[in-house]
Amino acid sequence: IRDGGIQELSKMDVIVISVGSLTKNEQRLEELKGSLEAIKSFVPDVVKAGFNGIFVTITNPVDIVTYFVRELSGFSKNRVIGTGTGLDSARLKRILSEVTNIDSQVIQAYMLGEHGDTQIANFSSATIQGVPFLDYMKTHPEQFKGVELSVLEKQVVRTAWDIISGKNCTEFGIGCTCSNLVKAIFHNERRVLPCSAYLDGEYGYSGFYTGVPAIIGSNGVEEILELPLDERERKGFEDACAVMKKYIEVGKSYKIV
């Protein structure tokens, strides 16, 4: 590992943006101005130097920052990706694994929307070893005695803050989430991963980034998968999208672009 200059980045296939300084008492969206000022200081120069690869963004608030990375770079929507709800989805799978005592690798479940407080768990489309999760709950009532899905969802949302309150940062989980995205790009895995992707009609929305499952390959976001949502999930996703739109307007007021 060594330091280098902007010009050397022109040869890279992927650039990971990970600047951030979240404190214990801060919400992710409260980081917005500082994060946008940070990306404005280098993204245009990186593109000017000849970088023609894919940006992967970790920086919070990741959905909003990823939107402005695309605006600053002028790249196509598929070549700017955020980690989004990737880590949150992994946490949901871990929690469901603990409840059911089944390997998380055979559990398919996603958190959708904002990587933040308004994200929602897509229980209605989740599966355990191919069995619809809600059906599995009905046939295994002993495992879910006293378990409320709303509490599990809130547990996912609170996990990051519990970690930050304990050691003042998070690094291993988000590092693994980011490496999965980069690996899928490098090896053209066409793997379905939850990430922050640009909506262009999917789920009935357009013009911003939010957390959804997508096929990731050598071109970045190859395709966004539209999962069925029940009424509660649809309303929650709508609320999360409203937050995205609101803070994009806040970001624009900073005259970043």
Could you tell me what each predicted segment is?
Residues 19-21:
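Conserved NAD(P)H cofactor-binding loop of Rossmann-fold oxidoreductase domains
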Residues 15-17, 57-58:
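Redox-cofactor binding/interface segments in oxidoreductases and associated redox assembly factors
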Residues 1-13, 27, 245-254:
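Conserved N-terminal Rossmann-fold NAD(P) cofactor-binding segment
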Residues 27-94:
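Rossmann-like NAD(P)(H) cofactor-binding subdomain of soluble oxidoreductases
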Residues 24, 64, 164-166:
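Short, solvent-exposed loop/turn segments at secondary-structure junctions
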Residues 73-79, 88-257:
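C-terminal substrate-binding/catalytic lobe of Rossmann-fold NAD(P)-dependent dehydrogenases
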